Amino acid sequence: MLILIRQSYAPKLFFVNSYMNMKGIEKMYKIVKKKVLNPTVTLMEIDAPLIAKKAEPGQFIILRVDENGERIPLTVAGYDREAGTVRIIFQIVGATTEKLNHLEEGDCIHDFVGPLG
C-alpha cells in the first residue's frame, strides 16, 4: 500500500508492508544478502527499489521484522539504485535486532519504511 504524506517533516512517499511492482504484483522486502561482520554486528542488503531510488546519505529507514514486532529506526548504510537495494548494518542489542538477525537470505521483512530524515 502506498500512502502520500504532504507534511514538511515527512517524506513524500511512505511505504507500508509491501509495494506494487511495475506489473501490479505485491512484493515484500526480501533480504538478498546477509553478512555477519562480527558476533554482534550484521549487514543486510534489502530489495527495496522505491526506497533505494530516493535514498540520500544520512537518511534512515524504519523497519518491523514481523506484524507483532516493534518498529526500529536504522541508518541507511548504502544503496544501489540500479539493483534496487538498500544496505543496513545493525548491532544486536535487544529483542528486535535479535529477531532481525535470525532472518536469512530469501526471508522477508514485514515493514520497511523510508527513506526518512
Regions found by a protein language model. Give the residues of each.
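Methionine residue identity
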Residues: 1, 20-22
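Ferredoxin-reductase
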Residues: 23-105
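Generic structural signal for buried aliphatic residues
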Residues: 61, 109-112
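A generic "binding-loop/recognition-motif" signal
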Residues: 96, 115-116
